Amino acid sequence: MRAARNLIITLLVSSLLCGCTQTEQFKLYGESEEENTNISTWVGCGWSTKPGEKDAVSEAISIMEEGLKGKKPEYIIAFMTVDYNVTEIVEEILKHYPGVQLYGGTSCTAVLTKDGYHTSTNGALAVMGIYSENITFGVGGAEIGDEKSAREAGRAAITEAISNAGLDGKPDIVLITASPGHEEEILSGIEEVIGEDVPVFGGSAADNTIEGKWKQIANDRVYSNGVSVTAIFTSMKIGYAFESGYLIMEKEGVITKSSGRRIYEIDGKPAADVYNEWTSGKVFGKYANQTSGKVTILANATFYPLAKKVVGVDNKTHYISIHPESVNLSDRSISVFVNVSDGERVQLMHGTWEILLNRGQTTPAKALEKGNIEKGETAFGIYIFCAGTLLAIPENERDKLPLLVGQTIGAPFIGTFTFGEQGFIEGVGNVHENLANSIVVVG
């Protein structure tokens, strides 16, 4: 069975690569002004793994400018690993482009562009610059702390972003990079300003080792515990997709005791015991008989997550994926990375690394369909991929991910690996979940 799955992925990637060893096989926006005089959007992506912030930014921007064809970017997205000093990265970018709208944050272990999967012990940096006659960007941010709650920070960030765009009304879509831990409250604050019908897409900033070193970037500001957003106003087509991609299993129950991000009971029974039974002991079975201590189950639980089972206003059933983080063996509770409430129905899911990798093709394809965008029409994409699912994929398979994304959308893109994902589900609205991937495409 495993060999068959490996063969499927090999055939899929091979078919994508056939006939496209040269980038000219599909047209990129900004690639040839002479061939298409109707181009209104120029996009360049660059990257670097050079040591030192100055050299890394210089190399990444040099590559980015090739796609911009002499246009000065109005907006830049920057994703990087925490191996770099993020403040110095921001300062170097702004030296090249004073006053540019700058948005981004830190990524777990690597970053993505159409050129590949970029990782190094020196650090990895990716930038995407955009100049467009049909898109207006506004970046805003806020710190979470004594002066602002997470909800207030979300409200302040989107208010500033709209102001910096210089336009009134609701944006067409919002990008978000937040500090892990308060995502639902931040989304609520954003929705207080723009309503619940504007899609919000992005992910929680990450580091390499879950040590709290993550950063969020909003123009010239760098936060450790904050939120950065981009308000996008455009007449161009927008497509998006947001999914975990796991298989839905038969085991399900109702949360009967919970608090915040901890599940104490499912169907009136200790949550850990129920989860252990559902997974046939595959996640933490060897610790199941212990009655004290805490067991971290992140790695194994990646293949056996839970999901909130939600019925939307469209009467369709949707699944909001939950990553179990640890088990408290004393009270048999499970700590997770999303807010949970009594009465919510949860269901077991299951996945393999092959399924998680193949999302690099299926999710972008759904986004193109959603936006009614043809591959040749795509200007650019922003890709979000859960860091936990990345780490579940063997290292020697990870470089297939940008091949799948790039050949599916046929355009420049930038990607980051996150500690939580936010996106819009039709019939449900904007949600925070785990172990998901998403993409926004514009064309």
Predicted features along the sequence, with ranges:
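Bacterial N-terminal signal peptides that target proteins for export
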Residues: 1-8
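Small-residue-enriched flexible segments
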Residues: 29-75, 80-85, 89-96, 100-381, ...
